[in-house]
Amino acid sequence: MHYMLKTYLKLLQQANLVKSCCLYGKKDQIIENLTFDSRETMKRGLFICKGAAFKIDYLRQAFKNGAVCYIGEEHFPLDYEVPYILVKDIRKAMPVLAKQFYEDPSRELDLVGITGTKGKTTTSYYIKAIMDEYQKSIGLRSMGIISSIEVKDGVEHKTSSMTTPESMELYRHMKNAVSSGKHSMVMEVSSQALKYQRVRGLNFDVGVFLNISEDHISPSEHDDFEDYFSAKLSIFRQCQTACINLDSDKADRILQASRLAKSVITFGTGQADRIDGDVKNGRIPDIFGYDIQQEKGRINFRVKSGRFDERFTLGMPGVFNVENALAAIAVAYLYHIPVEYMIAGLKKVKVKGRMEQYVSHKRRLTVIVDYAHNRLSFEKLFQSVLMEHPFSKIVSVFGCPGNKAYNRRRDLGLIAGLYSKKVYLSADDPGEEQFTHISGDIARYVESVGCPYECIENRGDAIKRAIEEAEEESVVLVLGKGCETHQKIGKVSCAYPTDANFVKKYL
């Protein structure tokens, strides 16, 4: 069903977002398309003017392609009169428009949102694996997913360009999920999506908060840790049940914020020494993981809850993945999924670019490709590798992105330097910042802890060198890009063969 232009104007007015408007008699115009991409065909379309780099040429192109009205924060003088609605905040306006245009498909979905500094993607796939096992058994379609790797909504299956899409894309994917017969969807919710209103208006059945650590702090992201943390916590304003990791740093504050939700479920392993209040004094998680063991690339652990006490196995290495699995089990528990489907789903799932392990038995060499790219993920990964490969030397290959998250250069340099026998610094989306500047920043911290390093800008060459120079009984960690297929160099997103392809080529 399509709605008239006046319907969208009224919704924006009700949200107190309208500054002024001039519709030139078009208030009864039926709107059939909604987009912010001027390249799209938009017959009878409503065009959104957004972004610091927006140009009036985009608006001209939009009307050439069929737009009948534009919405933006400022008036653009064209050579001819066109209807417009000016709003106070275009980011707040976009989800209002999208929700109406796509008729709020979230109401017809069991919607799970996941936030946290690390583990969002893996947890998303763990939840999907469990739900798919169960839904297949009762004749339902598989769960939709919106992740930093891909979007699968039952109609579209595409590689993701950002962790959480803009609101109009988000609502379109949910509409696709409903129209294709899906009943559930899991999605990653980034701090940027929360801060910039991309998920505004959504009501999550479950909001999962995995963990928190300093990240994404730069002029183009978050001003400071408080801004970052507050953005993450805001997910609780729009979820029915909060799902909380009691092992996380700042768990006391996370629990306090979770009171905004109607109910709370907790998970963890009892590692609560950093938590204040009743948790530190003995609160047991609702979903309690214990007896964690690693064996031949698999992680075994037990989970105790109000309904079961069972043994689980993860098909992926990485002891830190137990926390992600516990989050997925907690979500499944809320949906009353029988435990046998939880066990089956977690046992078989693997996630692209996450703890992908390649072994040369001839050289007794292991290479692990992982997306770890911030302090928390580096700490967890290096500690896990030491536990799983106690007699091996560690060599690491990584870099940091240009012009953002500057704290990573210090954090990753120090952590990798402390754990590695040698570090190879290479390009990881340098953008418009010089690689020599980025690698120089990181190298200072690697060197400060006495670790040798080498700077090799070409990532494929760096991976090759690390593998060729690694001694027997070594673990080479190739970190930061996971399964990403593009490298941002200058203003261009260049095709990149993936870290895994280079590893398989040179191992």
What do the predicted segments below correspond to?
Residues 1-19, 43-46, 52, 263, ...:
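ATP-dependent carboxylate-amine ligase
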Residues 1-96, 100, 313, 317, ...:
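N-terminal leader/targeting and accessory segments in enzymes
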Residues 31-32, 43-44, 67, 81-82, ...:
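Short, well-ordered alpha-helix to beta-strand connector turns
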Residues 56-72, 84-93, 205-211, 226-230, ...:
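A short, gly/pro- and small-residue-rich
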Residues 72-73, 88, 147, 189, ...:
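Short loop/edge segments at beta-strand edges and connector loops
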Residues 77-78, 119, 151-153, 193-195, ...:
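Short, active-site-adjacent cap segments at secondary-structure transitions
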Residues 78-80, 179-180, 206-367, 443-447, ...:
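Acidic, Mg2+-coordinating active-site environments of NTP-dependent enzymes
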Residues 93-246, 250-262, 326, 332, ...:
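Phosphate-binding loop of NTP-binding sites
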